[in-house]
């Protein structure tokens, strides 16, 4: 499989609304960008030229939306071939996907949780290995937010994630906000959850905001500022596992670049504090 240079430390989701501001000058704190390949693969014209302008100058990560790695439908190998060509064309450093599914006989337009079972571990792992073979690179799976536990689950979310990583021999894209969301919705300690994850598999992290629907129900929206408990959880995550490349994810209610940069700088500040304290895991 292809080997790629390590990502730098702090990234921002690349959104079309931000392109004019970014063309005027990318702030020095932004080390890399992230896109969903499905949103760009078949585009031509000005959009394609804009993307190439930035991928020629900055490192990029691709975070997939529609592979449906845990879904019952056959793996979309035509899509995977397109993704591989796209990753090669734009020299993308890392490809990640959601540890969930989004299609059955048709696209479901949402990311749904996989039942936490031994059978599902083997099924997902087989599909991940096939994905890695086609893409010719190692991938990372992102822990997903979910709101209703499957009645057929026979293992915990944590045990399921660890088992899939081991069986598939892939890496972990740790979404810190998703852990917080699930900890509120399913009543567990997010620090204990993150502590039990394998440090050597964590290659990438996300930070994002959410919507508080009720006292014991929050929705992962990527449409609001990161709240203090999630910032604290990121700080503790770095303390437990070391600093990994971390991206600010904002998909809705996108504010001006200047406002997003406050949160990007907050990530950089927390990382710097861990570097100053002698954290040996700097990338």
From Swiss-Prot:
Gene3D superfamilies: Divalent-metal-dependent TIM barrel enzymes (3.20.20.150). Pfam families: MbnB_TglH_ChrH. This is UPF0276 protein Nmul_A2550. Transmembrane segments: none annotated. Belongs to the UPF0276 family.
């Amino acid at each position: 499989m292809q080997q790629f240079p390590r990502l730098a430390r702090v990234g921002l989701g690349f959104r079309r609304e931000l392109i004019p501001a970014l063309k005027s000058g990318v702030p020095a704190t932004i080390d890399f960008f992230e896109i969903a390949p499905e949103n760009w693969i078949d585009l031509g014209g000005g959009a394609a030229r804009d993307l190439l302008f930035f991928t020629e100058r900055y490192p990029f990560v691709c975070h997939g939306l529609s592979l449906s790695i845990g879904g019952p439908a056959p793996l979309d190998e035509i899509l995977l071939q397109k993704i591989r060509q796209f990753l090669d064309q734009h020299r993308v450093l890392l490809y990640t996907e959601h540890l969930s599914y989004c299609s059955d006989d048709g696209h479901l337009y949402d990311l749904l949780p996989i039942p936490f079972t031994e059978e599902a571990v083997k099924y997902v792992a087989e599909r991940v290995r096939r994905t890695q073979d086609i893409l010719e690179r190692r991938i990372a799976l992102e822990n997903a937010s979910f709101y209703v536990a499957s009645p057929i689950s026979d293992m915990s979310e944590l045990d399921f994630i660890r088992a899939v990583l081991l069986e598939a021999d892939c890496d972990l894209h740790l979404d810190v906000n998703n852990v917080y969301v699930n900890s509120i919705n399913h009543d567990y300690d997010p620090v204990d959850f993150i502590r039990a994850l394998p440090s050597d598999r964590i290659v990438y992290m996300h930070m994002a905001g959410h919507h508080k629907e009720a006292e014991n129900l929050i929705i992962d929206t990527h449409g609001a500022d990161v709240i203090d408990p999630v910032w604290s959880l990121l700080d503790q995550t770095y303390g437990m596992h070391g600093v990994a490349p971390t991206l600010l994810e904002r998909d809705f209610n996108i504010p001006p670049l200047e406002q997003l940069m406050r949160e990007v700088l907050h990530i950089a500040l927390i990382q710097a504090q861990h570097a100053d304290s002698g954290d040996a895991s700097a990338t």
